[in-house]
Protein backbone atom coordinates (compact mmCIF):
# COMPACT_ATOMS: atom_id res chain seq x y z
CA UNK A 1 0.00 0.00 0.00
CA UNK A 2 1.24 3.48 -0.82
CA UNK A 3 1.40 5.51 2.41
CA UNK A 4 2.56 8.67 0.67
CA UNK A 5 -0.74 10.51 0.32
CA UNK A 6 -1.59 14.15 -0.35
CA UNK A 7 -2.39 16.02 2.84
CA UNK A 8 -4.51 19.13 3.37
CA UNK A 9 -1.36 21.23 3.03
CA UNK A 10 -0.87 19.96 -0.54
CA UNK A 11 -4.15 21.33 -1.87
CA UNK A 12 -5.55 24.84 -2.34
CA UNK A 13 -8.68 25.13 -0.22
CA UNK A 14 -9.34 28.89 -0.10
CA UNK A 15 -13.00 29.59 -0.82
CA UNK A 16 -13.63 25.94 -1.62
CA UNK A 17 -16.23 23.72 -0.02
CA UNK A 18 -14.34 20.94 1.75
CA UNK A 19 -16.13 17.78 2.90
CA UNK A 20 -14.20 16.43 5.91
CA UNK A 21 -14.87 12.87 7.14
CA UNK A 22 -14.13 12.93 10.88
CA UNK A 23 -14.48 10.28 13.53
CA UNK A 24 -17.00 11.72 15.99
CA UNK A 25 -18.15 8.29 17.17
CA UNK A 26 -17.97 9.37 20.81
CA UNK A 27 -19.65 7.85 23.88
CA UNK A 28 -22.72 9.71 25.14
CA UNK A 29 -24.48 9.59 28.49
CA UNK A 30 -27.88 11.32 28.52
CA UNK A 31 -26.82 13.53 25.62
CA UNK A 32 -23.48 14.49 27.21
CA UNK A 33 -20.18 13.47 25.62
CA UNK A 34 -18.20 11.40 28.15
CA UNK A 35 -14.91 11.13 26.22
CA UNK A 36 -13.85 14.03 24.00
CA UNK A 37 -10.58 12.58 22.69
CA UNK A 38 -11.90 12.16 19.14
CA UNK A 39 -13.18 15.73 19.04
CA UNK A 40 -9.85 17.06 20.27
CA UNK A 41 -8.10 14.92 17.64
CA UNK A 42 -10.10 16.53 14.83
CA UNK A 43 -9.39 20.15 15.84
CA UNK A 44 -6.01 20.67 14.11
CA UNK A 45 -7.46 19.79 10.69
CA UNK A 46 -10.60 21.89 11.20
CA UNK A 47 -8.62 24.90 12.48
CA UNK A 48 -6.14 24.70 9.58
CA UNK A 49 -9.01 24.73 7.05
CA UNK A 50 -10.72 27.62 8.88
CA UNK A 51 -7.48 29.58 8.81
CA UNK A 52 -7.11 28.99 5.07
CA UNK A 53 -10.61 30.31 4.37
CA UNK A 54 -12.24 27.04 3.35
CA UNK A 55 -15.95 26.32 3.75
CA UNK A 56 -15.89 23.26 5.99
CA UNK A 57 -18.57 20.56 5.85
CA UNK A 58 -17.98 17.95 8.55
CA UNK A 59 -19.47 14.46 8.46
CA UNK A 60 -19.20 11.39 10.69
CA UNK A 61 -21.07 8.33 11.85
CA UNK A 62 -22.01 7.63 15.45
CA UNK A 63 -22.89 4.20 16.77
CA UNK A 64 -24.97 1.78 14.74
CA UNK A 65 -28.36 3.29 13.88
CA UNK A 66 -28.65 0.64 11.13
CA UNK A 67 -29.87 2.94 8.38
CA UNK A 68 -32.59 4.82 10.23
CA UNK A 69 -32.71 7.98 12.35
CA UNK A 70 -32.29 7.39 16.08
CA UNK A 71 -32.51 10.52 18.22
CA UNK A 72 -30.01 9.20 20.79
CA UNK A 73 -27.40 8.85 18.00
CA UNK A 74 -27.82 12.37 16.62
CA UNK A 75 -24.64 14.42 16.21
CA UNK A 76 -26.28 17.50 17.78
CA UNK A 77 -24.21 17.19 21.04
CA UNK A 78 -21.06 17.07 18.87
CA UNK A 79 -22.05 20.28 17.04
CA UNK A 80 -22.64 22.03 20.38
CA UNK A 81 -19.35 20.93 21.91
CA UNK A 82 -17.33 21.69 18.75
CA UNK A 83 -18.84 25.21 18.70
CA UNK A 84 -17.42 25.75 22.20
CA UNK A 85 -14.04 24.26 21.33
CA UNK A 86 -13.67 26.34 18.15
CA UNK A 87 -15.17 29.55 19.60
CA UNK A 88 -17.36 29.63 16.54
CA UNK A 89 -20.86 28.36 15.82
CA UNK A 90 -20.84 24.99 14.09
CA UNK A 91 -24.09 24.97 12.13
CA UNK A 92 -25.86 21.63 12.56
CA UNK A 93 -27.74 20.48 9.46
CA UNK A 94 -30.34 18.26 11.09
CA UNK A 95 -31.67 16.16 8.20
CA UNK A 96 -32.78 12.59 8.79
CA UNK A 97 -31.65 11.82 5.24
CA UNK A 98 -28.30 13.60 5.96
CA UNK A 99 -28.20 15.53 2.67
CA UNK A 100 -31.61 17.22 2.83
CA UNK A 101 -32.99 20.75 2.63
CA UNK A 102 -31.26 21.90 5.86
CA UNK A 103 -27.85 20.71 4.67
CA UNK A 104 -28.23 22.20 1.19
CA UNK A 105 -29.39 25.55 2.58
CA UNK A 106 -26.64 25.65 5.24
CA UNK A 107 -23.95 24.92 2.64
CA UNK A 108 -25.37 27.52 0.22
CA UNK A 109 -25.24 30.21 2.91
CA UNK A 110 -21.63 29.46 3.96
CA UNK A 111 -18.94 32.12 4.01
CA UNK A 112 -15.20 31.36 3.98
CA UNK A 113 -14.16 29.87 7.35
CA UNK A 114 -17.68 28.68 8.23
CA UNK A 115 -18.28 25.19 9.61
CA UNK A 116 -21.32 22.97 9.04
CA UNK A 117 -21.84 19.50 10.57
CA UNK A 118 -24.07 16.99 8.78
CA UNK A 119 -26.26 14.45 10.59
CA UNK A 120 -25.01 10.90 11.38
CA UNK A 121 -24.04 9.33 8.03
CA UNK A 122 -25.29 5.92 9.20
CA UNK A 123 -28.86 7.26 9.34
CA UNK A 124 -28.68 6.24 5.68
CA UNK A 125 -28.64 2.50 4.97
CA UNK A 126 -26.58 3.14 1.81
CA UNK A 127 -23.62 4.42 3.88
CA UNK A 128 -22.21 1.06 5.00
CA UNK A 129 -22.94 -0.56 1.63
CA UNK A 130 -21.01 2.17 -0.23
CA UNK A 131 -23.96 2.72 -2.59
CA UNK A 132 -23.54 5.36 -5.30
CA UNK A 133 -26.72 7.27 -4.63
CA UNK A 134 -25.58 8.50 -1.18
CA UNK A 135 -21.94 8.99 -2.24
CA UNK A 136 -23.17 11.30 -5.03
CA UNK A 137 -25.38 13.28 -2.65
CA UNK A 138 -22.54 13.82 -0.17
CA UNK A 139 -20.09 14.76 -2.93
CA UNK A 140 -22.59 17.21 -4.48
CA UNK A 141 -22.14 19.49 -1.45
CA UNK A 142 -18.39 19.97 -1.89
CA UNK A 143 -15.40 20.63 -4.18
CA UNK A 144 -12.74 18.76 -2.20
CA UNK A 145 -12.69 15.71 0.10
CA UNK A 146 -10.54 15.30 3.21
CA UNK A 147 -10.50 12.06 5.22
CA UNK A 148 -9.41 12.41 8.83
CA UNK A 149 -11.14 9.34 10.29
CA UNK A 150 -8.52 6.64 10.73
CA UNK A 151 -10.89 4.61 12.90
CA UNK A 152 -13.05 3.84 9.84
CA UNK A 153 -10.29 3.79 7.20
CA UNK A 154 -10.58 0.00 6.95
CA UNK A 155 -14.22 0.33 5.85
CA UNK A 156 -15.29 1.06 2.26
CA UNK A 157 -18.32 3.28 2.98
CA UNK A 158 -19.90 6.17 1.07
CA UNK A 159 -18.32 8.80 3.34
CA UNK A 160 -14.84 7.21 3.31
CA UNK A 161 -14.47 5.82 -0.23
CA UNK A 162 -17.59 6.39 -2.38
CA UNK A 163 -17.31 10.20 -2.38
CA UNK A 164 -13.83 10.01 -3.95
CA UNK A 165 -15.42 8.76 -7.19
CA UNK A 166 -17.02 12.20 -7.56
CA UNK A 167 -14.58 14.51 -5.76
CA UNK A 168 -11.32 14.17 -7.62
CA UNK A 169 -9.28 16.13 -5.06
CA UNK A 170 -9.01 13.84 -2.04
CA UNK A 171 -6.42 14.30 0.71
CA UNK A 172 -5.83 13.24 4.30
CA UNK A 173 -6.13 15.44 7.36
CA UNK A 174 -3.51 15.73 10.11
CA UNK A 175 -4.81 12.75 12.12
CA UNK A 176 -4.52 10.26 9.27
CA UNK A 177 -1.22 11.83 8.20
CA UNK A 178 0.18 11.12 11.68
CA UNK A 179 -1.13 7.52 11.65
CA UNK A 180 0.47 6.90 8.25
CA UNK A 181 3.75 8.38 9.40
CA UNK A 182 4.14 6.25 12.53
CA UNK A 183 2.37 3.02 11.59
CA UNK A 184 3.71 3.20 8.02
CA UNK A 185 7.29 3.63 9.20
CA UNK A 186 6.93 0.84 11.75
CA UNK A 187 5.71 -1.58 9.11
CA UNK A 188 7.94 -0.44 6.23
CA UNK A 189 11.20 0.91 7.66
CA UNK A 190 11.41 0.53 11.44
CA UNK A 191 14.47 1.43 13.45
CA UNK A 192 15.82 -1.86 14.79
CA UNK A 193 15.58 -3.80 17.03
CA UNK A 194 11.84 -3.83 16.22
CA UNK A 195 9.71 -5.43 18.95
CA UNK A 196 5.98 -6.15 18.58
CA UNK A 197 3.79 -7.08 21.54
CA UNK A 198 0.50 -8.84 20.93
CA UNK A 199 -2.05 -9.56 23.65
CA UNK A 200 -5.79 -9.81 23.97
CA UNK A 201 -8.03 -12.82 24.20
CA UNK A 202 -7.93 -14.57 20.87
CA UNK A 203 -5.35 -15.90 18.44
CA UNK A 204 -8.07 -15.83 15.76
CA UNK A 205 -8.30 -12.01 15.98
CA UNK A 206 -4.58 -11.68 15.36
CA UNK A 207 -3.79 -14.60 13.01
CA UNK A 208 -2.80 -12.42 10.05
CA UNK A 209 -1.01 -9.91 12.27
CA UNK A 210 1.21 -12.63 13.78
CA UNK A 211 1.97 -14.03 10.34
CA UNK A 212 2.75 -10.63 8.79
CA UNK A 213 4.81 -9.35 11.74
CA UNK A 214 7.01 -12.47 11.80
CA UNK A 215 8.31 -11.24 8.42
CA UNK A 216 9.19 -7.83 9.86
CA UNK A 217 10.10 -7.90 13.56
CA UNK A 218 13.22 -8.91 15.49
CA UNK A 219 11.22 -9.94 18.59
CA UNK A 220 7.57 -10.92 18.91
CA UNK A 221 6.08 -10.97 22.42
CA UNK A 222 2.83 -12.82 23.09
CA UNK A 223 0.66 -12.41 26.19
CA UNK A 224 -2.99 -12.19 27.15
CA UNK A 225 -5.54 -14.95 26.61
CA UNK A 226 -3.99 -15.92 23.29
CA UNK A 227 -0.81 -16.93 25.12
CA UNK A 228 -2.47 -20.08 26.49
CA UNK A 229 -3.16 -21.46 23.02
CA UNK A 230 0.57 -21.04 22.33
CA UNK A 231 1.49 -22.71 25.64
CA UNK A 232 -0.75 -25.65 24.74
CA UNK A 233 0.96 -25.81 21.33
CA UNK A 234 4.29 -26.17 23.17
CA UNK A 235 2.88 -29.11 25.14
CA UNK A 236 2.27 -27.44 28.51
CA UNK A 237 -0.84 -28.01 30.64
CA UNK A 238 -3.13 -24.99 30.79
CA UNK A 239 -5.89 -26.05 33.21
CA UNK A 240 -9.15 -24.20 32.58
CA UNK A 241 -7.50 -21.33 30.71
CA UNK A 242 -8.99 -19.78 27.62
CA UNK A 243 -7.89 -21.83 24.60
CA UNK A 244 -8.79 -22.01 20.93
CA UNK A 245 -8.42 -25.71 20.16
CA UNK A 246 -8.69 -25.07 16.42
CA UNK A 247 -5.72 -22.67 16.57
CA UNK A 248 -3.25 -24.92 18.42
CA UNK A 249 -1.88 -26.31 15.16
CA UNK A 250 -1.58 -22.81 13.70
CA UNK A 251 0.29 -21.67 16.82
CA UNK A 252 2.78 -24.52 16.30
CA UNK A 253 3.30 -23.34 12.71
CA UNK A 254 3.97 -19.80 13.95
CA UNK A 255 6.50 -21.08 16.52
CA UNK A 256 8.27 -22.89 13.65
CA UNK A 257 8.07 -19.84 11.39
CA UNK A 258 9.70 -17.67 14.08
CA UNK A 259 12.61 -20.14 14.31
CA UNK A 260 12.94 -20.21 10.54
CA UNK A 261 12.97 -16.40 10.29
CA UNK A 262 15.35 -15.96 13.23
CA UNK A 263 12.70 -14.03 15.16
CA UNK A 264 12.93 -14.11 18.94
CA UNK A 265 9.43 -15.32 19.91
CA UNK A 266 8.79 -14.67 23.60
CA UNK A 267 6.03 -16.64 25.33
CA UNK A 268 5.06 -16.73 29.03
CA UNK A 269 7.35 -18.74 31.35
CA UNK A 270 5.11 -18.22 34.39
CA UNK A 271 1.50 -17.16 34.90
CA UNK A 272 -0.81 -15.53 37.41
CA UNK A 273 -3.77 -17.88 37.79
CA UNK A 274 -7.00 -18.21 39.79
CA UNK A 275 -9.71 -20.79 40.35
CA UNK A 276 -12.40 -18.51 38.90
CA UNK A 277 -12.85 -15.55 36.55
CA UNK A 278 -13.65 -12.93 39.16
CA UNK A 279 -12.18 -9.62 40.28
CA UNK A 280 -12.03 -10.93 43.86
CA UNK A 281 -10.39 -14.26 42.95
CA UNK A 282 -7.13 -14.98 44.82
CA UNK A 283 -4.12 -14.72 42.49
CA UNK A 284 -1.61 -17.60 42.47
CA UNK A 285 1.74 -17.44 40.63
CA UNK A 286 2.81 -20.63 38.84
CA UNK A 287 6.42 -21.84 39.06
CA UNK A 288 6.68 -22.43 35.31
CA UNK A 289 4.55 -22.51 32.16
CA UNK A 290 2.21 -25.26 33.42
CA UNK A 291 -1.18 -24.38 34.89
CA UNK A 292 -2.79 -26.93 37.22
CA UNK A 293 -6.22 -28.48 36.92
CA UNK A 294 -9.02 -26.21 38.16
CA UNK A 295 -7.02 -23.01 37.56
CA UNK A 296 -7.11 -20.51 34.71
CA UNK A 297 -4.40 -18.11 33.56
CA UNK A 298 -5.45 -14.46 33.94
CA UNK A 299 -2.12 -12.61 33.56
CA UNK A 300 1.54 -13.14 32.70
CA UNK A 301 3.70 -13.93 35.74
CA UNK A 302 6.42 -11.70 37.26
CA UNK A 303 9.35 -13.57 35.62
CA UNK A 304 7.66 -13.23 32.23
CA UNK A 305 6.93 -9.53 32.83
CA UNK A 306 10.64 -8.95 33.58
CA UNK A 307 11.77 -10.73 30.37
CA UNK A 308 9.21 -8.81 28.30
CA UNK A 309 10.23 -5.48 29.89
CA UNK A 310 13.92 -6.14 29.19
CA UNK A 311 13.15 -6.88 25.52
CA UNK A 312 11.19 -3.62 25.28
CA UNK A 313 14.01 -1.64 26.89
CA UNK A 314 16.52 -2.82 24.29
CA UNK A 315 14.25 -1.96 21.33
CA UNK A 316 14.34 1.03 18.99
CA UNK A 317 10.75 0.56 17.73
CA UNK A 318 7.91 -0.98 19.78
CA UNK A 319 4.36 -1.65 18.62
CA UNK A 320 1.82 -2.89 21.18
CA UNK A 321 -1.68 -4.22 20.56
CA UNK A 322 -3.68 -5.99 23.28
CA UNK A 323 -3.32 -6.30 27.09
CA UNK A 324 -1.23 -9.00 28.82
CA UNK A 325 -3.99 -10.12 31.18
CA UNK A 326 -7.41 -9.28 32.55
CA UNK A 327 -6.43 -5.66 33.02
CA UNK A 328 -9.81 -4.63 34.45
CA UNK A 329 -9.24 -6.91 37.50
CA UNK A 330 -6.65 -5.25 39.79
CA UNK A 331 -5.05 -8.57 40.83
CA UNK A 332 -4.41 -9.47 37.17
CA UNK A 333 -3.33 -6.09 35.78
CA UNK A 334 0.36 -6.24 36.65
CA UNK A 335 1.60 -7.71 33.36
CA UNK A 336 -0.09 -4.96 31.38
CA UNK A 337 1.20 -2.31 33.80
CA UNK A 338 4.81 -3.58 33.54
CA UNK A 339 4.71 -3.56 29.72
CA UNK A 340 3.24 -0.04 29.73
CA UNK A 341 5.93 1.13 32.20
CA UNK A 342 8.75 -0.35 30.12
CA UNK A 343 7.41 1.44 27.04
CA UNK A 344 6.96 4.72 28.94
CA UNK A 345 10.59 4.54 30.15
CA UNK A 346 11.95 3.67 26.71
CA UNK A 347 13.70 6.01 24.26
CA UNK A 348 12.33 3.95 21.37
CA UNK A 349 9.55 4.94 18.99
CA UNK A 350 6.56 3.55 20.93
CA UNK A 351 3.28 2.95 19.15
CA UNK A 352 0.06 1.79 20.79
CA UNK A 353 -2.37 0.14 18.39
CA UNK A 354 -5.63 1.54 19.68
CA UNK A 355 -8.36 -0.33 21.52
CA UNK A 356 -7.74 -1.88 24.95
CA UNK A 357 -4.00 -1.11 25.04
CA UNK A 358 -4.70 2.57 24.42
CA UNK A 359 -7.29 2.57 27.21
CA UNK A 360 -4.82 0.85 29.57
CA UNK A 361 -2.02 3.32 28.81
CA UNK A 362 -4.33 6.31 29.31
CA UNK A 363 -5.80 4.94 32.57
CA UNK A 364 -2.25 4.46 33.89
CA UNK A 365 -1.35 8.03 32.93
CA UNK A 366 1.38 7.03 30.46
CA UNK A 367 -0.40 8.44 27.39
CA UNK A 368 1.93 11.41 26.96
CA UNK A 369 5.02 9.18 27.28
CA UNK A 370 4.17 7.25 24.07
CA UNK A 371 5.28 8.42 20.65
CA UNK A 372 1.93 7.61 19.10
CA UNK A 373 -1.40 6.19 20.26
CA UNK A 374 -3.45 5.06 17.29
CA UNK A 375 -7.02 6.31 17.02
CA UNK A 376 -8.25 3.14 15.33
CA UNK A 377 -8.27 -0.31 16.91
CA UNK A 378 -9.57 -2.32 13.95
CA UNK A 379 -7.87 -0.09 11.38
CA UNK A 380 -4.46 -0.31 13.08
CA UNK A 381 -4.77 -4.11 13.29
CA UNK A 382 -5.51 -4.37 9.57
CA UNK A 383 -2.61 -2.00 8.93
CA UNK A 384 -0.30 -4.35 10.89
CA UNK A 385 -1.69 -7.27 8.88
CA UNK A 386 -0.34 -5.55 5.78
CA UNK A 387 -3.82 -5.06 4.35
CA UNK A 388 -4.70 -2.14 2.13
CA UNK A 389 -7.09 0.21 3.93
CA UNK A 390 -9.78 1.32 1.44
CA UNK A 391 -10.26 4.76 3.03
CA UNK A 392 -6.56 5.50 2.55
CA UNK A 393 -6.10 3.84 -0.84
CA UNK A 394 -8.89 6.13 -2.17
CA UNK A 395 -6.92 9.33 -1.43
CA UNK A 396 -4.67 11.07 -3.98
CA UNK A 397 -1.04 9.92 -4.05
CA UNK A 398 1.53 12.64 -3.51
UniProtKB/Swiss-Prot annotation:
Any Pfam family matching the protein: PGK
Keyword entries, A-Z: ATP-binding, Cytoplasm, Glycolysis, Kinase, Nucleotide-binding, Transferase
Subunit record text: Monomer.
Places the protein is found: Cytoplasm
UniProt-listed Enzyme Commission number(s): 2.7.2.3
UniProt family annotation: Belongs to the phosphoglycerate kinase family.
Lineage: Bacteria, Bacillati, Bacillota, Clostridia, Eubacteriales
GO cellular component: cytosol
GO biological process: gluconeogenesis; glycolytic process
Catalysed conversion reaction: (2R)-3-phosphoglycerate + ATP = (2R)-3-phospho-glyceroyl phosphate + ADP
Protein name: Phosphoglycerate kinase
Tagged with keyword Membrane: no
Amino acid sequence: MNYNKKSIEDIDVKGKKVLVRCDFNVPLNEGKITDENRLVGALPTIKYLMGKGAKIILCSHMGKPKGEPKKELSLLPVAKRLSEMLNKEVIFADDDNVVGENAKRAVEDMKDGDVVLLQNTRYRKEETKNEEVFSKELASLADVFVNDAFGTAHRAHCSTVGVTNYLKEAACGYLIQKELKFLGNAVEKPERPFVAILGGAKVSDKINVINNLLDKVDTLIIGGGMGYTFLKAQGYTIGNSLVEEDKVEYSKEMIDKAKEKGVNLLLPIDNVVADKFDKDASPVVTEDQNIGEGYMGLDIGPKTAKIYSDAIKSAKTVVWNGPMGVFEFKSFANGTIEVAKAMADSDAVTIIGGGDSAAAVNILGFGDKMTHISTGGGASLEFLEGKELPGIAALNDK
